[in-house]
């Protein structure tokens, strides 16, 4: 059985991201195989790295908290068999750069792997979309305009003038890094920094593309059509693949994430898949019953008010709520709360009729005059 990730890092389940990071750094220093030569230190370090990778990522941590290991679906990188790249570090010297201010090669004189200057994935973008109440319920299509980086069509992302190509950086020999040996309390380390000549790519563009000035990407305003699924709610996030920024040096684009907010409705209130609203009826409609037309998200709907309806009665309109995302044929309900309106003013004839009705029912009628007596008289009809 897999060990609990929180126990692995010796933190509580409500630990903050900073607490998790602090705990990981402390334990990683202790168990890193370049420092700790004990048998099992490397396996422990792998477990620590995997625990940190999961718990430092909000989405993965939420899935783990809810479903445990099953919630990760095998998709979490840097597992026990994946030493390189664990916890977001490119290799062993990456983590030492993080811990020891840019020193690597703990006394081993080891050569760090060259960072490739090839294609890299573009950045994801965020777009905040405000929907009307009923747009969120029934979905549809909307056009939005975004500004993003696209691959330069002239150089196809290389940054070089057509017919030419990037040259190996002479300053770093194509490694993308420059090194300097330093002695520290931990032993002999190599200080590693990105090459200032090629910015860490290992390549230099000597003949820049005239269209993008060597950047390989250009800014563009694009209008795209978004399909909004029925049933989205405030806080929903939609993903549009490939509409983020183009990657560097011809790499694949990132994604566009659309964060949804929904305007309030003057009549309806939503809770999950259900809709709530209030309708007013007269005291006579409550006593005698009636049919009335009420507003729903589908339009006017006739409802039956049964005789003797009490104040605050809730009627259920089955299947008139919000469609379920992914299964729009299944919908929640619409709950209609009835408010019985008692008149504050009454004509002499109506008052006389109500008095006779009260006597016929054998109910005491208030002798009070004016509004106070009227309210008492009508109130007795509901008891």
Curated annotation (Swiss-Prot):
- Identify the stretches annotated as CXXCXGXG motif repeats: 152-159, 169-176, 195-202, 209-216
Kindly list the positions annotated as binding Zn(2+) 1. 152, 155, 209, 212
Which PROSITE patterns does the UniProt record give?
Answer: DNAJ_1 (PS00636), DNAJ_2 (PS50076), ZF_CR (PS51188)
List, separated by semicolons, the cofactors it needs: Zn(2+)
Record's GO cellular component terms: cytoplasm
Q: Could you state a single Gene Ontology molecular function term?
A: ATP binding
Can you give the residue ranges of the J domain?
4-68
Q: Where is Zn(2+) 2 bound in this sequence?
A: 169, 172, 195, 198
Q: Does the keyword Cell inner membrane apply?
A: no
Question: Which of UniProt's keywords are assigned here?
Answer: Chaperone, Cytoplasm, DNA replication, Metal-binding, Repeat, Stress response, Zinc, Zinc-finger
Gene Ontology process terms (BP)? chaperone cofactor-dependent protein refolding; DNA replication; protein refolding; response to heat
Report if keyword Amino-acid biosynthesis is assigned: no
InterPro entries, sorted: DnaJ (IPR012724), DnaJ_C (IPR002939), DnaJ_domain (IPR001623), DnaJ_domain_CS (IPR018253), HSP40/DnaJ_pept-bd (IPR008971), HSP_DnaJ_Cys-rich_dom (IPR001305), HSP_DnaJ_Cys-rich_dom_sf (IPR036410), J_dom_sf (IPR036869)
Which Pfam families does UniProt cross-reference here?
DnaJ, DnaJ_C, DnaJ_CXXCXGXG
Zinc fingers (CR-type), as residue ranges, are: 139-221
SMART domains in the record, alphabetically?
Answer: DnaJ (SM00271)
Q: Please state where this protein is localized.
A: Cytoplasm
Q: How does it assemble?
A: Homodimer.
Function, as annotated, reads:
Participates actively in the response to hyperosmotic and heat shock by preventing the aggregation of stress-denatured proteins and by disaggregating proteins, also in an autonomous, DnaK-independent fashion. Unfolded proteins bind initially to DnaJ; upon interaction with the DnaJ-bound protein, DnaK hydrolyzes its bound ATP, resulting in the formation of a stable complex. GrpE releases ADP from DnaK; ATP binding to DnaK triggers the release of the substrate protein, thus completing the reaction cycle.
Domain comment from the record reads as follows:
The J domain is necessary and sufficient to stimulate DnaK ATPase activity. Zinc center 1 plays an important role in the autonomous, DnaK-independent chaperone activity of DnaJ. Zinc center 2 is essential for interaction with DnaK and for DnaJ activity.
What HAMAP family does the record tag this protein with? DnaJ
Which PANTHER family does the record match to this protein?
Answer: CHAPERONE PROTEIN DNAJ A6, CHLOROPLASTIC, DNAJ HOMOLOG 1, MITOCHONDRIAL-RELATED
Q: Which family does it belong to?
A: Belongs to the DnaJ family.
The protein's name: Chaperone protein DnaJ
Species whose genome carries this gene: Gloeobacter violaceus (strain ATCC 29082 / PCC 7421)
Traced from the root, the source organism's taxonomic lineage reads: Bacteria, Bacillati, Cyanobacteriota, Cyanophyceae, Gloeobacterales
């Amino acid at each position: 059985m897999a060990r609990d990730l929180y126990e692995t890092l010796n933190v509580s389940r409500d630990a903050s991201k900073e607490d998790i990071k602090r705990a990981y750094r402390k334990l990683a220093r202790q168990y890193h195989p370049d420092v700790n030569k004990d048998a099992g230190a490397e396996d422990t370090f792998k477990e620590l790295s995997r625990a940190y990778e999961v718990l430092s990522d909000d989405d993965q941590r939420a899935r783990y908290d809810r479903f445990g290991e099953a919630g990760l679906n095998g998709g979490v990188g840097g597992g026990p068999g994946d030493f390189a790249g664990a916890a977001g570090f490119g290799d062993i010297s990456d983590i030492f750069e993080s811990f020891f201010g840019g020193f690597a090669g703990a006394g081993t004189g080891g050569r760090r792997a060259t960072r490739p200057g090839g294609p890299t994935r573009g950045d994801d973008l965020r777009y905040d979309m405000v929907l009307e109440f009923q747009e969120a319920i029934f979905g549809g299509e909307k056009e939005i305009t975004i500004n993003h980086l696209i691959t330069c069509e002239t150089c196809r992302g290389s940054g070089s003038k057509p017919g030419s190509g990037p040259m190996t950086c002479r300053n770093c020999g194509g490694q993308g890094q420059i090194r300097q040996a330093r002695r520290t309390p931990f032993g002999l380390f190599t200080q590693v920094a990105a090459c200032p000549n090629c910015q860490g790519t290992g390549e230099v563009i000597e003949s820049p593309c005239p269209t993008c000035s060597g950047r390989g990407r250009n800014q563009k305003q694009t209008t795209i059509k978004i399909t909004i699924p029925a049933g989205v709610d405030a806080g929903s996030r939609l993903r549009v693949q490939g509409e983020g920024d183009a990657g560097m040096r011809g790499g694949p684009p990132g994604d566009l994430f659309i964060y949804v907010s929904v305007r309030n409705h003057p009549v309806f209130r939503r809770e999950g898949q259900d809709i709530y609203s209030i309708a007013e009826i007269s005291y006579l409609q409550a006593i005698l019953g009636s049919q009335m037309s009420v507003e729903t998200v589908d339009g006017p709907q006739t409802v039956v008010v049964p005789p003797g309806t009490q104040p605050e009665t809730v009627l259920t309109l089955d299947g008139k709520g919000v469609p379920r995302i992914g299964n729009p044929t299944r919908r929640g309900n619409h709950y209609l709360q009835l408010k019985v309106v008692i008149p504050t003013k009454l004509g002499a004839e109506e008052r006389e009729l109500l008095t006779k009705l009260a006597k016929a029912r054998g109910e005491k009628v208030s002798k009070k005059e004016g509004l106070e007596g009227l309210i008492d008289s009508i109130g007795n009809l509901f008891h």
